[in-house]
Amino acid sequence: MERRTRVEIVRDEFYINGKPTYQGVTYKGAKIQGLLLNSRMVQGIFDDLNPETRELWKYPDTGKWDPDRNTREFVEAMPVWREHGLLSIVVGMQGGNPQGYRTDQPWRNSAFTPEGELVPEFMERLRSILDKADELGMVVQLNVFYFGQDEHFIDESAILRALDNACRWVLENGYGNVILDVVNETDVPHYEHEILMPARVHELVQRAKEIEYGGRRLLAGTSFKGGSIPTGQVVSVSDFVLIHGNGVEDPNQIAEMVETVRLMPEYRPMPILFNEDDHFDFEKDKNNMMSAINAYASWGFLECGDNNYRDGYQSPP
């Protein structure tokens, strides 16, 4: 199976098809070569299997929710994102919060059964996104587990099975443009299984890295909540360091987070990547994005949006 896009890491730079990203490019005097500028678009394969909440996502023109339409329109928009310089998107196998920062999450949105098997309909929608990203030369950061859905796994063995199945599916389908955010914000105190929490999450990152097919494996890391610094155990096993800027009001703190990671004894030359930050202020000289770039860290846009079909971002429809 011939694929067009292959992501690699060379020291602290991301490479696509053997060349550093944004080769030779600077932005406002700062080097962006090797960075992976990205946007959190986690609801690309969203569906809601809870009949009590499914109607929340109905389209204004049809009065019904349609997960295939959601993915189809997502894929149709991807070339526009790429034309504007976006090289990476975050897509979730268990989505994210479809109502922004709502605390309870009664919806059922997961590419896994409670036993950890893959749900074919979700995976076919994921296939269409990965195919388009491969065609466009884009990298997909695939988030495997999300704290709004982990309670539906029957036990820890189901989580291990889910991770194994996800990694094998990506590898067996030949995708070279996927990197893993194994657990989204592992230190958020809503996870119910210990292996998804900070003290043990490094086990999952290591497990993902050990799954091979055809001599290939996936690059992997895991994210922590906004303002948090990853544990040394996680940094030591990760291919790249994931951090979040949500809740970080002072752009100077963004640079401090990057420096703190680089000073950790477990750190070695590898990319540092924000893949979630809901602060903008792009018109100002100082903002979180520029602080990240000036510290030579990739930055990721997060806009929760509204459930109005016009300003959705990660809030369907």
Task: Specify the residue positions occupied by each region the protein language model found.
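Non-catalytic positions within long, well-ordered alpha-helices that form the structural scaffold/packing
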Residues: 79-83, 171, 234, 292-294
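The substrate-binding groove and active-site-proximal loops of carbohydrate-active enzymes
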Residues: 55-72, 107-123, 145-159, 183-196, ...
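Active-site-adjacent substrate/metal-binding segments within catalytic domains
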Residues: 5-135
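Active-site groove signature of glycoside hydrolases
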Residues: 94-96, 136-153, 162-195, 229-230
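Aromatic/hydrophobic pocket-lining residues that form the small-molecule binding cavity
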Residues: 70, 74, 119-126, 159-163, ...
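Extended, well-ordered alpha-helical scaffold segments
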Residues: 125, 129, 133-136, 155-166, ...
